[in-house]
Amino acid sequence: MIDSDGFRANVGIIICNRYGQVMWARRFGQHSWQFPQGGVDDGESAEEAMYRELYEEVGLRPEHVTVLTSTRSWLRYRLPKRLVRQDSKPVCIGQKQKWFLLQLKSQDSAINLSSSGHPEFDDWRWVSYWYPVRQVVSFKRDVYRKVMKEFAVTALSFQTQEIPKKRVRQKTTG
């Protein structure tokens, strides 16, 4: 669904764990990382699109997550000119996104990047809450900053446990 201004309707998904970290996924066969996202189909609500994309991209079902909140408005970003497909009609110049903040209720093992026949991601990890703002591709950075700022109080209030410290092995001599 591309609107009259050339923006494609899209949903973005931020999944947080009980440590206040967020899921960060690497695009299949690329070096770029991002949050799961995807288009809203004709006749589909933003929430319906979010659940469909959640399963297609990371293999999670509604019972695996709790929806904590969503953005108050649609956030937009423009694609760089090199990524705009001028031969497609209508021309899509960017995305308008409704974002959802989810809390993972299940174990990490429920995440399955190959749940659909065409994986979007080939790796994922938990990262600190603000990490994605600095790491996402530059043309998405402003939207990421806005959504992370809007969700911060909610996301960080659901941190129920401290991140386990990695055990460091002591070298023994002798």
Curated annotation (Swiss-Prot):
GO terms for molecular function: mRNA 5'-diphosphatase activity. The keyword Lyase does not apply. It is an enzyme of class 3 (hydrolase). A motif (Nudix box) lies at residues 38-59. GO terms for biological process: mRNA catabolic process. It holds the Pfam family NUDIX. Keywords: Hydrolase. Residues 6-149 form the Nudix hydrolase domain. Its EC number is 3.6.1.-. Its cofactor is a divalent metal cation. GO terms for cellular component: cytoplasm. It comes from the Bacteria. Belongs to the Nudix hydrolase family. RppH subfamily. Accelerates the degradation of transcripts by removing pyrophosphate from the 5'-end of triphosphorylated RNA, leading to a more labile monophosphorylated state that can stimulate subsequent ribonuclease cleavage. This is RNA pyrophosphohydrolase. It comes from Shewanella oneidensis (strain ATCC 700550 / JCM 31522 / CIP 106686 / LMG 19005 / NCIMB 14063 / MR-1). The lineage of its organism: Bacteria, Pseudomonadati, Pseudomonadota, Gammaproteobacteria, Alteromonadales.
